[in-house]
Protein backbone atom coordinates (compact mmCIF):
# COMPACT_ATOMS: atom_id res chain seq x y z
CA UNK A 1 0.00 0.00 0.00
CA UNK A 2 2.80 2.39 0.98
CA UNK A 3 4.71 1.70 -2.27
CA UNK A 4 1.63 2.39 -4.39
CA UNK A 5 0.97 5.61 -2.48
CA UNK A 6 4.55 6.76 -2.99
CA UNK A 7 4.34 6.07 -6.73
CA UNK A 8 1.10 8.06 -6.91
CA UNK A 9 2.71 10.99 -5.10
CA UNK A 10 5.69 10.89 -7.47
CA UNK A 11 3.31 10.88 -10.44
CA UNK A 12 1.41 13.92 -9.16
CA UNK A 13 4.59 15.84 -8.40
CA UNK A 14 6.26 15.03 -11.71
CA UNK A 15 3.12 15.86 -13.66
CA UNK A 16 3.21 19.32 -12.13
CA UNK A 17 6.95 19.73 -12.68
CA UNK A 18 6.73 18.67 -16.32
CA UNK A 19 3.59 20.58 -17.25
CA UNK A 20 5.43 23.75 -18.17
CA UNK A 21 8.24 21.85 -19.86
CA UNK A 22 5.90 20.14 -22.34
CA UNK A 23 3.26 22.87 -22.67
CA UNK A 24 4.35 23.86 -26.18
CA UNK A 25 4.88 20.28 -27.39
CA UNK A 26 2.22 18.92 -29.79
CA UNK A 27 0.01 16.53 -27.86
CA UNK A 28 0.34 13.66 -30.37
CA UNK A 29 4.13 13.86 -30.37
CA UNK A 30 4.10 13.80 -26.58
CA UNK A 31 1.76 10.79 -26.54
CA UNK A 32 3.97 8.95 -29.02
CA UNK A 33 7.03 9.64 -26.86
CA UNK A 34 5.30 8.47 -23.69
CA UNK A 35 3.84 5.36 -25.32
CA UNK A 36 7.20 4.49 -26.88
CA UNK A 37 8.87 4.98 -23.50
CA UNK A 38 6.48 2.53 -21.88
CA UNK A 39 7.20 -0.03 -24.60
CA UNK A 40 10.94 0.37 -24.12
CA UNK A 41 10.77 0.03 -20.33
CA UNK A 42 8.12 -2.70 -20.05
CA UNK A 43 8.71 -4.72 -23.24
CA UNK A 44 12.40 -4.08 -23.94
CA UNK A 45 11.86 -2.68 -27.44
CA UNK A 46 14.58 -0.59 -29.05
CA UNK A 47 13.76 3.07 -29.72
CA UNK A 48 12.93 2.90 -33.42
CA UNK A 49 10.67 -0.11 -33.09
CA UNK A 50 9.01 1.36 -29.99
CA UNK A 51 8.12 4.57 -31.83
CA UNK A 52 6.62 2.65 -34.74
CA UNK A 53 4.64 0.44 -32.36
CA UNK A 54 3.43 3.56 -30.52
CA UNK A 55 2.08 4.94 -33.80
CA UNK A 56 0.06 1.76 -34.28
CA UNK A 57 -1.27 1.70 -30.73
CA UNK A 58 -2.37 5.33 -30.95
CA UNK A 59 -3.99 4.83 -34.36
CA UNK A 60 -1.85 7.54 -35.94
CA UNK A 61 -1.12 7.59 -39.68
CA UNK A 62 2.15 6.16 -40.97
CA UNK A 63 3.40 9.58 -42.08
CA UNK A 64 3.00 11.15 -38.62
CA UNK A 65 6.26 12.88 -37.55
CA UNK A 66 7.99 10.94 -34.80
CA UNK A 67 9.64 12.48 -31.74
CA UNK A 68 13.42 12.29 -31.83
CA UNK A 69 15.35 9.79 -29.73
CA UNK A 70 16.34 12.43 -27.19
CA UNK A 71 12.68 13.20 -26.43
CA UNK A 72 11.84 9.51 -26.06
CA UNK A 73 14.83 9.02 -23.75
CA UNK A 74 13.49 11.86 -21.58
CA UNK A 75 10.10 10.13 -21.49
CA UNK A 76 11.82 6.85 -20.55
CA UNK A 77 13.46 8.50 -17.54
CA UNK A 78 10.11 10.02 -16.55
CA UNK A 79 8.40 6.63 -16.84
CA UNK A 80 11.07 4.95 -14.71
CA UNK A 81 10.81 7.65 -12.05
CA UNK A 82 7.03 7.28 -11.93
CA UNK A 83 6.53 3.54 -12.14
CA UNK A 84 9.68 1.59 -11.28
CA UNK A 85 11.99 3.83 -9.28
CA UNK A 86 12.14 1.18 -6.53
CA UNK A 87 13.28 -1.70 -8.75
CA UNK A 88 15.06 -0.20 -11.75
CA UNK A 89 18.38 0.72 -10.06
CA UNK A 90 18.94 -2.85 -8.92
CA UNK A 91 18.00 -4.27 -12.31
CA UNK A 92 20.34 -1.80 -14.03
CA UNK A 93 23.20 -2.77 -11.74
CA UNK A 94 22.63 -6.48 -12.44
CA UNK A 95 22.72 -5.85 -16.19
CA UNK A 96 25.87 -3.73 -15.95
CA UNK A 97 27.54 -6.43 -13.85
CA UNK A 98 26.66 -9.04 -16.47
CA UNK A 99 27.87 -6.72 -19.23
CA UNK A 100 31.20 -6.23 -17.45
CA UNK A 101 31.67 -9.98 -17.12
CA UNK A 102 31.35 -10.33 -20.88
CA UNK A 103 33.49 -7.28 -21.58
CA UNK A 104 36.28 -8.89 -19.56
CA UNK A 105 35.65 -12.18 -21.36
CA UNK A 106 35.92 -10.43 -24.76
CA UNK A 107 38.62 -7.98 -23.73
CA UNK A 108 40.82 -8.80 -26.74
CA UNK A 109 38.23 -7.19 -29.00
CA UNK A 110 38.07 -3.74 -27.36
CA UNK A 111 34.48 -4.06 -26.06
CA UNK A 112 32.37 -0.98 -25.44
CA UNK A 113 28.96 -0.91 -23.78
CA UNK A 114 26.20 1.11 -25.41
CA UNK A 115 22.43 1.39 -25.38
CA UNK A 116 20.13 1.54 -22.37
CA UNK A 117 22.48 -0.39 -20.07
CA UNK A 118 25.19 2.23 -20.61
CA UNK A 119 22.80 5.21 -20.52
CA UNK A 120 21.20 4.09 -17.26
CA UNK A 121 17.64 3.52 -18.48
CA UNK A 122 17.71 -0.29 -18.69
CA UNK A 123 15.36 -2.63 -16.84
CA UNK A 124 15.26 -6.41 -16.63
CA UNK A 125 13.48 -6.40 -20.01
CA UNK A 126 16.42 -4.69 -21.75
CA UNK A 127 19.10 -6.39 -23.82
CA UNK A 128 22.82 -5.77 -23.41
CA UNK A 129 24.58 -4.26 -26.42
CA UNK A 130 28.38 -4.62 -26.65
CA UNK A 131 30.27 -3.18 -29.58
CA UNK A 132 33.51 -4.98 -30.44
CA UNK A 133 36.25 -3.31 -32.50
CA UNK A 134 38.26 -6.08 -34.12
CA UNK A 135 41.35 -6.30 -36.33
CA UNK A 136 39.79 -9.38 -37.94
CA UNK A 137 35.96 -9.35 -38.21
CA UNK A 138 35.82 -13.14 -37.76
CA UNK A 139 38.03 -13.25 -34.66
CA UNK A 140 35.23 -12.62 -32.14
CA UNK A 141 33.06 -15.30 -33.72
CA UNK A 142 35.96 -17.77 -33.60
CA UNK A 143 36.50 -16.92 -29.92
CA UNK A 144 32.87 -17.80 -29.14
CA UNK A 145 33.18 -21.08 -31.02
CA UNK A 146 36.38 -21.93 -29.13
CA UNK A 147 34.57 -21.23 -25.84
CA UNK A 148 31.64 -23.42 -26.83
CA UNK A 149 29.19 -20.50 -26.73
CA UNK A 150 26.02 -20.82 -28.80
CA UNK A 151 24.97 -17.71 -30.72
CA UNK A 152 22.73 -16.49 -33.52
CA UNK A 153 24.08 -14.50 -36.45
CA UNK A 154 22.33 -11.49 -37.96
CA UNK A 155 23.08 -8.32 -39.91
CA UNK A 156 21.95 -5.08 -38.27
CA UNK A 157 22.27 -1.34 -38.79
CA UNK A 158 25.56 -0.02 -37.46
CA UNK A 159 26.85 3.24 -35.99
CA UNK A 160 26.67 5.17 -39.26
CA UNK A 161 23.78 3.31 -40.83
CA UNK A 162 26.01 0.69 -42.44
CA UNK A 163 25.24 -3.04 -42.13
CA UNK A 164 27.29 -4.79 -39.45
CA UNK A 165 27.42 -8.34 -38.16
CA UNK A 166 25.74 -9.07 -34.83
CA UNK A 167 26.23 -12.18 -32.70
CA UNK A 168 23.36 -12.69 -30.25
CA UNK A 169 23.71 -14.84 -27.14
CA UNK A 170 20.90 -15.82 -24.75
CA UNK A 171 22.25 -15.49 -21.20
CA UNK A 172 20.37 -17.13 -18.35
CA UNK A 173 19.80 -14.93 -15.31
CA UNK A 174 19.59 -17.05 -12.17
CA UNK A 175 18.38 -13.97 -10.28
CA UNK A 176 15.36 -13.44 -12.54
CA UNK A 177 14.87 -16.99 -13.84
CA UNK A 178 14.78 -15.77 -17.43
CA UNK A 179 17.05 -15.03 -20.36
CA UNK A 180 18.83 -11.76 -21.08
CA UNK A 181 19.83 -10.99 -24.66
CA UNK A 182 23.47 -10.10 -25.30
CA UNK A 183 24.26 -8.59 -28.71
CA UNK A 184 27.88 -8.40 -29.88
CA UNK A 185 28.14 -5.94 -32.78
CA UNK A 186 31.30 -6.40 -34.84
CA UNK A 187 33.14 -3.30 -36.10
CA UNK A 188 36.51 -2.69 -37.67
CA UNK A 189 39.21 -1.49 -35.29
CA UNK A 190 39.45 1.82 -37.18
CA UNK A 191 35.83 2.63 -36.31
CA UNK A 192 36.70 3.00 -32.63
CA UNK A 193 37.95 6.60 -32.72
CA UNK A 194 34.76 8.03 -34.17
CA UNK A 195 32.63 5.84 -31.92
CA UNK A 196 33.92 7.58 -28.79
CA UNK A 197 33.01 11.11 -29.90
CA UNK A 198 30.59 12.73 -27.45
CA UNK A 199 27.08 13.55 -28.61
CA UNK A 200 25.48 16.99 -28.82
CA UNK A 201 24.54 16.69 -25.14
CA UNK A 202 28.18 16.16 -24.18
CA UNK A 203 27.60 12.58 -23.03
CA UNK A 204 29.71 9.66 -24.21
CA UNK A 205 27.53 7.35 -26.32
CA UNK A 206 29.34 4.24 -25.05
CA UNK A 207 32.02 3.25 -22.59
CA UNK A 208 34.87 0.78 -22.25
CA UNK A 209 35.66 -1.67 -19.49
CA UNK A 210 37.13 0.89 -17.09
CA UNK A 211 34.17 3.23 -17.56
CA UNK A 212 31.71 0.44 -16.74
CA UNK A 213 33.71 -0.54 -13.64
CA UNK A 214 33.51 3.09 -12.54
CA UNK A 215 29.72 3.09 -12.99
CA UNK A 216 29.44 0.02 -10.77
CA UNK A 217 31.39 1.78 -8.02
CA UNK A 218 28.86 4.61 -7.91
CA UNK A 219 26.11 4.34 -5.27
CA UNK A 220 22.62 3.57 -6.63
CA UNK A 221 20.55 6.69 -7.33
Name what the model sees in each region.
Residues 2-3, 16, 20:
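Residue-identity detector for glycine
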Residues 2-5, 46:
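Coiled-coil-like amphipathic alpha-helices with heptad-repeat character
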Residues 8-9:
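Leucine-biased recognition of intrinsically disordered, low-complexity hydrophobic segments
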Residues 20-44, 51-124, 135-221:
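Catalytic core of pol beta-like nucleotidyltransferases
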Residues 129-135:
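Short hydrophobic/aromatic beta-strand micro-patches
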